[in-house]
Structures are given as structure tokens and as C-alpha cells.
Amino acid sequence: MKTRDMNRDWIATAETLSSALPYLQRYDDAIVVIKLGGHAMGSDEGMESFARDVVLLRQVGVNPVIVHGGGPMINALLDKLQIKSEFVNGKRVTDAATMEVVEMVLSGMVNKRIVQAINAQGGKGIGLSGKDANLITCEATDPALGFVGTPSEVNADMLKNLFEKEFIPVIAPIGSGTAGETFNINGDTAAGAVAAALKADRLLLLTDVAGVKNAEGVVVTELKAADVEEMTAAGVIAGGMIPKTETALAAVRGGVRACTIVDGRVPNAVLLELFTDHGAGSMIRS
């Protein structure tokens, strides 16, 4: 005969699952685009945890799409090859030599690491870049930035076809130009374009900061578009946070219900943001 004492941990687990029910119902068949920043990838254990969360999303009926970065990995290889990098407003200046390294790291090393992690958890991760099936078509952002592209069109139908087969798309932010060029796309920008094209229910930008902070250094949990514009004009939002908030504004104005800048270092950050009252970052709405 088996016996078991009911302890507080088990009861707390059951209560957590029960309280998540309204959120699970809300996100049934929802599209959630997740930007996984290079700084948020962390250790193998962190990647395993992230992959488990993504597979869980798929299991409960959510259609997740991963768009990833890889800045630290790109920098490491550029340093090894003694190729210098410059940044303008958070965007990497990309010459031909740098573009080769960027594509090698993003489409090869980083993309396949994420796909492998998802598949190891029982998911059906499939690796793509924006060049596959013209997934992301680009225009040059600024001649001064070299091969840096701004998305002009996203093949949303291809992603929807993958959802029907229960695949989890993992997208490297590399795009094609109309003349056959290869462009480096800021990962946040690529994620925002994908989310807008899909009219996603949520866009989550996972990074290595707690969220958008006010002038006193306190994380602001909810912001309107006007708040973001005011804080940017005042210099409170600056540096690498600018592309993220610009992405958030473009996404919500393009039809995404909400965008949250999430601290990807927090365990189970994606689940906390979607399925609890607490959340895990700064949510931006129109």
C-alpha cells in the first residue's frame, strides 16, 4: 500500500496550475513572438529552461515563434578574426566581411543551438533565416550602416503553415534584398516585423535587463506609447533600450496587442509573463 503526505509544495503547485487556467484559455491558439537576445541566452541550463517553456507553450495550444539575436557570439568571432565593429544607435555597422561572420554565427551556430534545445525537450523546432522562402525581405536601412536591413515584407503565410504542423519556427534575423543582397537585421526589429505581420497576440523581447526604468531607476511595469515617447525625448530611455522600445511601438501600432520587454535571466520568465498576474518586465500598449 502506498501512502503520501500532502505537503505545502504540492498544494502550492496545484494552486499555481489552477490560477493559470484563465490565462491558458486566453492564449489558446494565440500567436506569441519571442525575441531571445544573445545576452539572455546564458548557460546551457538557462537554454534548457527556455526551451522547456517554449515547448510547454506549444503543448497548451500557443503558437510560439522565436526570433533570436547573437551579439555576444558575433563579437567574440569578430574579435577572434580581428574584424572591428562599430555601432550607431544600437545598430551594428555591417560591411561585407562582417556580414559573412554575422550570417555564419546567427544562421549556423546560434540558430541550431536553440533548435536543438527545443527538440531535446520534445518540441518540433525548425531553424530558418529570413532568406528562406523570402521569409523577410529587406531594404537598406542607411548607407552609413552598410548591409543593415529594415524589413519591408514578411511571408506570414509560411509561418502559419508551420503552425498547422505544430512546428516551432526559430528565425535568424538575416534578410534578403530585392537585388539578392544579404542584410543583417537588428533582432528586435526583425521580431517586431514578424509579430506585426502575424498580428501576434503578444511580442516578448527577452533581454538581460529588468525592463524599462524611469528616471529614478525603477522598472515601469506598464507604459503607453505616449509614455515611451516622453521618456525617450527626455533621455531616460537611451542606448540599447531605444531599438527595443522603437520595436515595441511599431509592433503595437502594427496590430500586436501588447509588447513586453522581459528579463530573460529570470527562470521561467516567459511563463511568468503570460500565465500569471505578476508578469516579468515592462508591458507597452498603444
Swiss-Prot record:
Q: Which residues cross the membrane?
A: none
Give me the Gene Ontology terms describing cellular component: cytoplasm
Write down the chemical reaction(s) this protein catalyses: N-acetyl-L-glutamate + ATP = N-acetyl-L-glutamyl 5-phosphate + ADP
Identify the domain of life. Bacteria
The reply to whether Transferase figures as a keyword in the UniProt entry is yes
Pathway assignment: Amino-acid biosynthesis; L-arginine biosynthesis; N(2)-acetyl-L-ornithine from L-glutamate: step 2/4
Report the SS bond pairs.
none
Give the chief site where it resides: cytoplasm
Instruction: From the Swiss-Prot or TrEMBL record, state where the protein is found.
Output: Cytoplasm
Give GO BP annotations, semicolon-separated. arginine biosynthetic process via ornithine; L-arginine biosynthetic process
**GO molecular function (one):** ATP binding
**What are the site positions for Transition state stabilizer?**
K35, K244
Enzyme superclass (EC): transferase
* UniProt-listed InterPro entries: AceGlu_kinase-like_sf, AcgluKinase_fam, ArgB, Asp/Glu/Uridylate_kinase, Glu/AcGlu_kinase, NAGK-C
Stated EC number for the protein is 2.7.2.8
UniProt keyword annotations, A-Z: Amino-acid biosynthesis, Arginine biosynthesis, ATP-binding, Cytoplasm, Kinase, Nucleotide-binding, Transferase
- Name the residues that bind substrate: G70, G71, R92, N184
The UniProt family comment states: Belongs to the acetylglutamate kinase family. ArgB subfamily.
Biological role stated in the UniProt entry: Catalyzes the ATP-dependent phosphorylation of N-acetyl-L-glutamate.
The name under which this protein is listed is Acetylglutamate kinase
Q: Which organism is it from?
A: Ruegeria sp. (strain TM1040) (Silicibacter sp.)
Gene that specifies this protein: argB
